[in-house]
């Protein structure tokens, strides 16, 4: 990537968008746009060594750490904002020294907590560990001015520093396990505030008006709590709770607001006592190739500095952010992408699409923003409600918890085959045909799954046979021939097995296309009987030290028959066969009447709204995930592209170091440990690759997680598990309730 030089360089010219006609959506995309300017730090070659920075008046202080073989160093780059001056101070430390909480005062002096330790383990019976802490002050050149020892209350008591801050009046505050200590600029102790037994000295935030806040986690409310604190007495008052999920934010002092809050969506303003946060900057609307901004320092109501980790380069970058006047944001047609949480691959492609597409712009509507500390499902519920009401975003990132069959039966999604067939750069034959078929409905493709994993059950071939698929009767026959005490699965409860059974074999009991349900069938009654043998919960006493010492050999030693397995690449199969089991295995699947108990878990699942007004634009975005550029970038999970999987197979079979498809030198090394014994695992063979490919191509059932369905079955099956009703009685009740549920949601 081209390096950009200058104090404030790399100005990103934003081609940002709005819908025509002045809609609320287009207005929103314009209101929260900032441009980014990279702060050039020529003195630092490896920007990823930067850890923090401070702004004092017109000067930036950038702090970083380098680790050498025999020593380590801390560097401080001092840079005027106008570029007129720039210099660097390097502080060399020994390997047993560490500088923490490094900061700078208004005069340019540096303060830190210096940790020095000594270790001698040459004599195991006389292990020596000594550790000392100091409050250290240095001048602008890094010369020591004074050093104050920091200790606990007792001679042998453990000591550690929670944080060190310079207060607005110049005093230094240090919080430790014993409370708060205030020092003057010469290192003299001014006051000690003892921490009460029922109180916790959390982090300290100084607002621009001088107010000091203490932030700590409230176990009573399961939220982060802000309290005003009297620094002289340590007394706290006036509790405040940020709306939403408080843990998703980082907290910084603001100018136009008491606090600036940063999430992976953007930057928000918050005034103490407000019931809502105010969005200031949206990362996607601003074309920011990063998921977070760290260490925000505001300069004005419309400017702030912050550090990012660039998603494209992986580099740490110090940026200046400046609000863009909405009238200067370029108009484009708006596409809405809905999701319940967003992955980095989608996020990056949205940013790239928005930068390069001259006609369309994507706005993300992430429903996870509605979740709260009290209820993490609010967003998913709201998304489902919107979809059921007919409001479907132009592009939707599906979640396995959503009732996709219900949506398809209502005609909410667009058939994608027509777009693929007309696309001159795409050929359906280049992809796993069974995966495409799995997401068809009546010959139409409504879901695009460009990457996936396989959820299955594995067992020794000598136990379960060589062919995939089996029934509960066949599993019971195998178990009947095993010694008493043999487990079917390791550490699985009745509830977890119920979930697995619904996720991996529910297709045999519901047909969403016809609405037919079979929960009063003999097959389902047998499933209930199978589930009853699993414990409601395990006693921790069942898992003593001996159990955990032998855990890695449970399958090898035939103490456990089966392993629930996520097959996400050739290495995972190789590890499972040659490590977990140590012999030939069969990917058997969960027992099911139709012998089809393995499922496809989409790593990404995209759909297009049937009523979208911008289908051409939606497809322009979606097609990228079928292109070689994306398919060849997949390293976790299975790509849809057969050619990419062939390359992955070739790499997995290599025994010598090689350069992978990402340009990295890779040396094969895979091991399995049984206790302290290391077992070297040979690379996968061509025959094993063929076995894996044949299995993958045989799987044609999508993985689902229908919480409503699981809840119905769990509630109604409980009387059977407790002995109050027989299996047939509860099966009839479940059949009735599920049939109503299906009828209402088709």
Language model features: what each stretch is:
Residues 20-70, 75-79, 83, 116-120, ...:
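Conserved N-terminal structural module of periplasmic/extracytoplasmic solute-binding proteins
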Residues 361-431, 440, 552-562, 578-579:
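Extracytoplasmic "Venus flytrap"/periplasmic binding protein-like
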Residues 407-411, 417, 432-473, 491-515, ...:
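Periplasmic solute-binding protein
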Residues 417-430, 507-528, 579, 589-599, ...:
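Short, solvent-exposed loop/beta-turn-alpha elements that line the ligand-binding surface or hinge
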Residues 514-548, 575, 585-590:
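Glycine-centered hinge/linker elements that transmit conformational signals in sensory
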Residues 577-654, 697-698:
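Extracytoplasmic/periplasmic substrate-recognition and gating elements
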Residues 600, 662-738:
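C-terminal capping/gating helix-and-loop segments adjacent to ligand/active sites or protein-protein/ligand interfaces
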């Amino acid at each position: 990537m081209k390096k950009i030089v200058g104090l404030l360089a790399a100005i990103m010219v934003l081609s940002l968008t709005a819908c025509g006609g002045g809609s609320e959506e287009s207005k929103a995309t314009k209101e929260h746009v900032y441009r980014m300017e990279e702060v050039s730090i020529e003195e630092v070659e490896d920007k990823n060594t930067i850890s923090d920075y401070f702004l004092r008046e017109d000067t930036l202080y950038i702090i970083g750490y380098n680790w050498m073989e025999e020593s380590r160093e801390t560097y401080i780059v001092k840079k005027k904002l106008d570029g007129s001056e720039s210099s660097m101070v390097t502080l060399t430390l020994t390997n047993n020294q560490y500088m923490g909480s490094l900061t700078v005062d208004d005069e340019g002096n540096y303060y830190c907590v210096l940790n020095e330790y000594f270790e001698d383990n040459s004599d195991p019976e006389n292990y020596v560990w000594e550790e000392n802490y100091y409050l250290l002050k240095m001048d602008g050149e890094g010369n020591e001015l004074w050093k104050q020892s920091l200790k606990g209350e007792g001679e042998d008591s453990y000591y550690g520093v929670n944080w060190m801050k310079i207060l607005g009046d110049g005093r230094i505050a240090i919080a430790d396990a014993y409370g708060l200590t205030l020092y003057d600029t010469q290192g003299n102790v001014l006051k000690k505030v003892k921490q009460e037994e029922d109180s916790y000295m959390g982090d300290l935030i100084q607002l621009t008006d001088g107010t000091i806040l203490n932030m700590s986690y409230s176990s009573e409310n399961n939220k982060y709590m802000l309290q005003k604190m009297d620094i002289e007495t340590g007394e706290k008052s006036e509790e405040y709770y940020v709306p939403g999920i408080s843990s998703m934010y980082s907290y910084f002092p603001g100018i136009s607001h008491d606090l600036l809050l940063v999430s992976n969506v953007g930057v928000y303003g918050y005034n103490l006592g407000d019931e809502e946060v105010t969005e200031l900057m949206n990362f996607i609307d601003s074309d920011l190739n990063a998921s977070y901004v760290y260490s925000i320092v505001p300069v004005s109501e419309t400017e702030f500095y912050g550090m990012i980790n660039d998603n494209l380069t992986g580099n740490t970058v110090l940026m200046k952010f400046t609000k863009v006047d909405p009238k200067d944001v370029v108009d484009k047609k708006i596409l809405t992408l809905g999701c319940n949480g967003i992955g980095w691959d989608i996020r990056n492609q949205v940013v790239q699409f928005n930068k390069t597409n001259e006609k369309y712009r994507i706005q993300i509507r992430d429903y996870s923003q509605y979740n709260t500390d009290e209820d993490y499902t609010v967003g998913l519920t709201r998304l489902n409600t919107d979809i059921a009401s007919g409001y479907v975003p132009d592009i939707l990132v599906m979640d396995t918890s959503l009732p996709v069959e219900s949506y398809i039966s209502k005609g909410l999604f667009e058939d994608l085959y027509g777009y693929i067939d007309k696309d001159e750069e795409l050929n359906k034959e280049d992809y796993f045909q069974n995966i495409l078929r799995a997401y068809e409905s009546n010959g139409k493709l409504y879901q695009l799954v460009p990457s996936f994993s396989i959820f299955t059950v594995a067992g020794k071939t000598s136990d379960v046979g060589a062919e995939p698929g089996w029934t509960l009767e066949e599993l019971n026959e195998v178990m009947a021939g095993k010694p008493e005490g043999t487990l079917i699965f390791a550490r699985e409860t009745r509830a977890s097995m119920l979930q697995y059974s619904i996720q991996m074999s529910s297709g045999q009991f519901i047909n969403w296309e016809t609405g037919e349900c079979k929960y009063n069938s003999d097959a389902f009654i047998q499933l209930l009987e199978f589930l009853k043998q699993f414990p409601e919960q395990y006693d921790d006493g069942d898992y003593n030290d001996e159990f955990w010492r032998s855990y890695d050999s449970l399958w090898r030693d035939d103490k456990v028959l089966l392993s629930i397995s996520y097959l996400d690449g050739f290495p995972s199969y190789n590890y499972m066969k040659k490590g977990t089991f140590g012999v030939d295995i069969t990917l058997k699947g969960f027992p099911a009447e139709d012998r089809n108990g393995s499922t496809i878990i989409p790593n990404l699942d995209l759909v297009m709204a049937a009523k979208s007004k911008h289908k051409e634009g939606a497809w322009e975005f979606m097609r990228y995930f079928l292109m070689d550029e994306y398919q060849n970038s997949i390293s976790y999970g299975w790509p849809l592209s057969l050619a990419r999987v062939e390359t992955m197979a070739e790499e997995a079979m290599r025994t010598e170091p090689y350069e992978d498809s990402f340009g990295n030198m890779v040396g094969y090394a895979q091991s399995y440990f049984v206790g302290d014994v290391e077992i070297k695992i040979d690379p996968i063979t061509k025959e094993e690759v063929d076995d894996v490919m044949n299995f993958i191509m045989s799987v044609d059932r999508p993985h689902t997680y229908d919480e409503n369905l699981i809840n119905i079955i769990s509630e109604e099956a409980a009387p059977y598990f407790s002995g109050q009703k027989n299996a047939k009685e509860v099966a009839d009740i479940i059949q009735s309730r599920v049939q109503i549920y299906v009828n209402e949601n088709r």
